[in-house]
Amino acid sequence: AAFGAGDVTVELTETDGSLAVSVQAQNTPVRELVLTWKAVFNGSGEVLGDTWERGYGDLEWKKEADHIGMPWYFFRHEAGKCLAFGVKVRPSAMCWWEKDGADVKLHLDVRCGTYGVELGGRKLEAAKIVMTSYALEEADTPVEVFEACRAFCSEMCDDPDCRDTVIYGGNNW
């Protein structure tokens, strides 16, 4: 499917179990794409999302709230199932999810600094979206939910860089 406004075209293509989002523009600088899925949620649930930098003890299941940015991926746990929403690793956009009432929005920020990217007619694959739902057994245990989240994180990465040796490092600016 393709959508357009002016000289900007957004293309959605199903491929390898994901939905590729591409944008093409001749002259218009593109800043952000926002995709919305209508009426995804009904009822209440809890969400677990990532953080932009690193976790400071704040990664936890929380009562869902509207308009909270959840970078890269998030999970929603409700009775009997775990819903998973994410983008595959190494996208060409800064991606974050947002709950807006019953809707889900995905923001794809393709700016260059604070300016829109000037594509000059080129096509940019902004991200590959993956979504799934995991049915949980009647017990609906934390272990089941953890395993669903773990499986989805594996789905987001087609080519993990697993090393034979230990890698040491720090992120202390």
Where are these regions (language model features)?
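Carbohydrate-recognition beta-sandwich/jelly-roll modules
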Residues: 1-173
